[in-house]
Amino acid sequence: MPPSAHWGKRPRSGDSEEAFVRFSELSPAAKMERRREERGEKKERERTLAYFKSVQRALEEHGSGGGDAGALASIVDGFFSELLKLLKADSTFYVLRNGTACRVIELALTSALLLHVKSLLYVFLGHICDLMVSPVASFTLETLLAALSQGLSALGETNPEGLVAELTEGGVGTHVGSGVPSSATLVRSMADELCERAEDLIVHDIGGRALRSVVMMLGGRAIRQAPQPPHPVAFPDVLGTLAEAIMKALEDGYGREYNTANAAESWMAAVQAPATSLVVQSLLRVSDEGSVVDRCVRQRIEALSYKGKPLLHHLLVDPLGCHVFQSYVQVPPPAAVVEAGDMAAARATAAASPSVSSAAKASANEASTAEEFKGKEEGELLVPGGADSCCWSRAAELVLLEVDNLLKPGSDLVAQTGYVLQDLVLYAPATLHLQWLWRRLLSPRLLLLFDVPALTAVLVQAVKRCAFEGVLLRPTGLAAQLRDAAGSDAVSTATAAAEAQNEVSHHGTVLPADVLSMLRKEAALHVRYSPVPIAFQSAVCARVCELAKQRAAKGAAQYLLVDGALSEKGHEVARYLMHLHPSASKLLQHSLDKLQREDLVAVVCHQKGSQFMQQYIKVAALATPTSAATAGDNAGDAKGPLMRLFRRLQSSLSTLIYDKYAAFMVETLYECASLGVKEALVKALVPIYQDMRKLSPSAGVAGAPAASEDGVEHAPQEPATAEEGEAAGNAEVASPSPTQQRFIAYKVMSRCCVEQYVHRKEDWTKLALRQCQVQQLLRRMLLSE
C-alpha cells in the first residue's frame, strides 16, 4: 500500500534536521514556547475552519435561490483565491484532512469557472497520489476532475477554438495571462504521477476508487453520479499511457506477490481483489476500438489462456472474475457491426407488410428474418458475424457453450449467470444479435427463466429490449405540430402539457415518466435499443404467452398478473409486453378478457397492475376508429375493448375511486376512451358523487387539493406520469387514511368532470368531444413519428 507516514501526521518545520526530544525533557522555557506555538496553530485552524463554514452557508443560501448569480460568482472567486493561498503556504495540505473543508471545496467546485478548476489542479500536482489515498481528500479530487470535464464540455459549446487550445499538451490553454498551463498538460502531469505509483494504487481500497474515477474521466465518462456532459471530452493518449502502466503494475505486482508462473495466473489473482478488479472493469468500459486501452486490456484478456482454456472462460465461471466478464460484454462494439445489424433489421422491416394481421404472415416474416442471419451458419453455433467481430459475440459464443453447465441443478453459478445473460440482452449490438440470442440461448430455456427466480430478470430484460426498440430519447415534435395544427383552447392546453412534460412517444403512446427515467439511465450506461422487427416482437410475445397458457387455464394475464408465480417480475413482464407494437401484443390483450372480475379488480388495485392497465387502455384506444371516438351512439363502440373493460369494473367503481392505484386507471380510462365510454363512465360516477356530497355537504370538487398537495399524491397532468410519484409513495406501508381516500375520490371526480356533467351537460359534451378530437390528433401524430 502507498506509504501514509506524512498523511495524517503533520511534520513540523525542521523535524527532519533536529533530533527527537520528548516534551518532558524540554526546559521550562522550551515547553512554554512549544505550547505557545500549539495554541497559535490551533487558533489559526479554528479561524480557517470558521471561514470555510461561512463560505458554506453563503453557497448554500445562493444555491437555494437566495441570491443573484453575480454575488455567487464573487463568493466563489474570493474563496478560491483564499484557498489557493492557503494551499501554497502549506505544502502538507493540512486543511484537506478536514472533512468539512473538503465538502465546502466540493460545493464551490459545482459553481467554479474553468480557471478555478485548473488552478486548483495545478496546485495539487506533486501531491496527487497522497490525495488519492486520503479518505476525504480523494472525494475532493474526484469532484475536481468532474468539474474539469464539465468545464471543458461547456467550453466546447461556446468556444471550440478554446477547447482545442486546452487539449494541446504543452500549451498555455485559453487563460494566457494566468500562468496556468492547458488542461491537457495538467492531466498529463497528473497521469505521470499515477503511473509511478500504479502498483500501490490498484491494491488500495480508497486509491483504487479514485483511480477508477480518473479512468472514467479520461475516457469521457461521467463520475461521482454527475450528469453526462452533452459533449464529452476525453483524453485518449493520456488514458492509453495510464492503462499501460496499470496493466504492467497488475501483471508484475501480482506476479511478484503470488510468484505466478505466467501472466494469466496474475490476472486470476488480480480479479480476486475487488479494488484491482474494479479498476480493470473501468478500463474495459472506456475501451474503444483501435485505442491503446483496447490493445493492452481487451486484446490482452483475449490472448491469454489458463490451464488449457481461454482466460475468458475462467472469468465466466469464477464468482469474482464474472464481474470482469460482464464488463467485457459491455465493451462498445465496432461501428461496422452495429451498422450491419441495423441494415439487416431495416431490410426485414421493409420486407414485412405494414400491418402484421395474420399469424401465418408473422411466422413467414420471422422465418425470413431468421434466414438472413442463419445462412451458412445453419447447424453451427456461430454468432452473427463470427466470434471475432466484437466482444459481445465472443462472450455470447462462450456462454452458449457453457450455459448448460452453469445452469445445471445444484450449481452455485446460477445467480451470476443470470447477470451475465441480462448484460448480453441489454448490450446486444443490433437486432441481429438479439434474435440469435433469443433463438439459441433464451427461448430453449424459457422454462428455466420462468421457474428460477434468479433468472426471471433475464426474461424481463429480453421483453423490455424488444418493447422499447428504436426509442429516441428526445422530446417529440408533438408540441410544435399541435401549435401549427390549430389554435383552439384544447389544443393549446395539450401543447403546453407536451412542452412542460418533455414527453417521448413510442408505438403511438407517450412513455410513462418512470419508464422514460429508466431508459435515460440506461442510455447513460450506453445501452442501445436498436430497432426490432414487428415479426420478432410477435414471436417473443407468442412464446411467452404460450408457455404461460400451459400453466394457467385463462392465459398469460392470469399467470403473470394474478397467480403471482413470477412475483413482482410477472407484472413487469406483462407491462413490457404491453409496450410492444400493438399488433404484436394481441395475445396478451385478448387474455385480459378471460380474467374473472374479482381478479381484474385486484390487478387494478395493485401498483404495478395499475401501471399495466393504464398502458393496456392506451393501446386499446389506438384500435378505436376515428368515427367511433367522436360518436356516442356508435354500434361498434359498444363492443370495443374499453367499453368491455368499463362494464366489468362498473359495479366496483365505488371502491376503485378510493384506491390510490386504481384511481389512476379510472382517470386514464376517461382520458383515452371514446365519447360513448366517457359518458357511460361519468353516468356511473354521478350517483357516487351525489352520495359523497350528501355525506360531506361542505366538500366538493371545488375543494379538491391544490397543486402543491397534488404533486404528493397524484401527478397534475398525465396519469402515466404519476407513476413516478407513486413509486415514492410506495414506501408507505399503511393504507390511505379516510382523508386521503376522499382526496383521491374527489380527484377522480374532478378529472372526469362529473360536476360539470351534472350541472352543465351541454358544456360537458362539447368539452368531451373536443378532448376526443385532440386525442385522435395526438395518436395520429405519435403514430406518424
Question: Where do the language-model regions lie?
Answer:
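Eukaryotic gene-expression regulator signature that favors modular helical reader/repeat domains
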Residues: 2-785
